[in-house]
């Protein structure tokens, strides 16, 4: 008898799918729903050091930008120097990475919902400009770490991240043999290394000279437009399927 209910079940599934596809329509000039983010982007004249490029329009506050520059900040109690002192050139990339995460209002096309205690959203597969990834890896490959994924698996018993039992401190190059291994694996695929270069308008720059404007605005617009086109095509196809299922349901009810 279950088969008799199939048209109704399929109709409900399609409606739910279509509605979920329309849930998040704001892809431009948005902030993630996360631990330290503002609800809406806006000017922050006193953003600190590496976060200063976002001062005209930021999702972070000045105090957040100050705190994230510390070796062990109170934002997440994360210690960059968990395997000895990280090279300054290497740490600079991690601070810029954190500034991008906390401050950028241009990551909307890649925001995904997550079920985590400290945030409800994250970004996934942000197309990072290939030079940014290459320089990050080159400046860090002689620094040391004990893990290839920094999102999980730490020993937090002291309140600060420490290497888990049995994890050996080795060079970054040992844990991340290629630039892509670092940029894509470090934060569980928050980034995806792009084939595009800085200034192309097709990849996100981790850092930029604000005097020249924010190049990531153009990148976000491009990918948001592409996503809207794809969503429109999907909804157009779904509309035909819904009509067919509605007719099937009507015949089923009459029968």
From Swiss-Prot:
Membrane topology: Lipid-anchor; GPI-anchor
Post-translational modification, as annotated: N-glycosylated.
An annotated Gene Ontology molecular function: folic acid receptor activity
Residue positions of covalent lipid attachment, annotated as GPI-anchor amidated asparagine: 230
GO biological process, one term: fusion of sperm to egg plasma membrane involved in single fertilization
Lineage: superkingdom: Eukaryota
Sites where a glycan is attached: 115, 195
Induction or repression: Up-regulated by retinoic acid.
Protein name listed in UniProt: Folate receptor beta
Gene designation per UniProt: FOLR2
């Amino acid at each position: 008898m279950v088969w008799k209910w199939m048209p109704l079940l399929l109709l409900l599934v399609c409606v739910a799918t279509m509605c979920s596809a329309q849930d998040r329509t704001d892809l431009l000039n948005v902030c993630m729903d996360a631990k330290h983010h503002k609800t809406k982007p806006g000017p922050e004249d006193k953003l600190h050091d590496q976060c200063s490029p976002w001062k005209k329009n930021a999702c972070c506050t000045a105090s957040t930008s100050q705190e994230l520059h510390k070796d062990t900040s109170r934002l997440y109690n994360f210690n960059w120097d968990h395997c000895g002192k990280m090279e300054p050139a290497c740490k600079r990339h991690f601070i810029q990475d954190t500034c991008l995460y906390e401050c950028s209002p241009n990551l909307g096309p890649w925001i995904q919902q997550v079920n985590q205690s400290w945030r409800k959203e994250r970004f996934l597969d942000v197309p990072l400009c290939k030079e940014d990834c290459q320089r990050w890896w080159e400046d860090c490959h002689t620094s040391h770490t004990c893990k290839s994924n920094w999102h999980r698996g730490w020993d937090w018993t002291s309140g600060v991240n420490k290497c888990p039992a049995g994890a050996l401190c080795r060079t970054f190059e040992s844990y991340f043999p290629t630039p892509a291994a670092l940029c894509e694996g470090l934060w569980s695929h928050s980034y995806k290394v792009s084939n595009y270069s800085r200034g192309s308008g097709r990849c996100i720059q981790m850092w930029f000279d604000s005097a020249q404007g924010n190049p990531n605005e153009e990148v976000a617009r491009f990918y948001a437009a592409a996503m809207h086109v794809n969503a429109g095509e999907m909804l157009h196809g779904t509309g035909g399927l819904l009509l067919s299922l509605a007719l099937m349901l009507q015949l089923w009810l009459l029968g």
